[in-house]
């Protein structure tokens, strides 16, 4: 058998992982704290990789900012990864978008955005969000603790938007949004994890793979 090779497929052909029944406390807490995402402009989130490790080919920055990417017929996906970090528990939630296009002639193929939800420890009862750190271009914005108006119960609310001519980013919002099926890093197939570790995404960077994840927690640490 030859070396593993990346395989890109049409952005609308990537099927998401169904959300598994959570078994461990960590998995149950990750599902409980799934954030809401409100898309103000641009693409809606799409699956980035399938069970075989085939990856989303994305879209050129042509047409309208939301052209050809208003939602996958197969359903969307939010990815997750968690870890203990500096005495607290971090859960990263990650979305993939086929293009990041604030307007014609601006932007790039592929976009990854994410938010890190910080809690004291993974417990099913009386879990409390200590902070949220959404990705904001090359860094993070931080709310310690989150504004109550930016929460819907245990779901932190975020908006995906662009302030022209700058590319899209996340910020907390009062607006309600949608949740997607969650698949955690350890729940994915080995082919999918390998693809997310190896495949290049141009100007966008996968924030939760083995080579990047802990560094992102370090950069976003809000305390």
Swiss-Prot record:
Its main location: secreted. Coiled coil: none annotated. InterPro entries: NPP1. A motif (Conserved undecapeptide motif) lies at residues 90-100. The keyword Secreted applies. Transmembrane segments: none annotated. Keywords: Host cytoplasm, Secreted, Virulence. GO terms for cellular component: extracellular region; host cell cytoplasm. Probable secreted effector that may act as a pathogen-associated molecular pattern (PAMP) recognized by the plant immune system. Seems not to induce necrosis, neither in several susceptible or resistant Vitis species nor in the dicot model plant Nicotiana benthamiana. The structure of NLP effectors is remarkably conserved with a high level of conservation of a central region containing the conserved undecapeptide motif AIMYAWYFPKD and heptapeptide motif GHRHDWE. Belongs to the Necrosis inducing protein (NPP1) family. This is NLP effector protein 3. It comes from Plasmopara viticola.
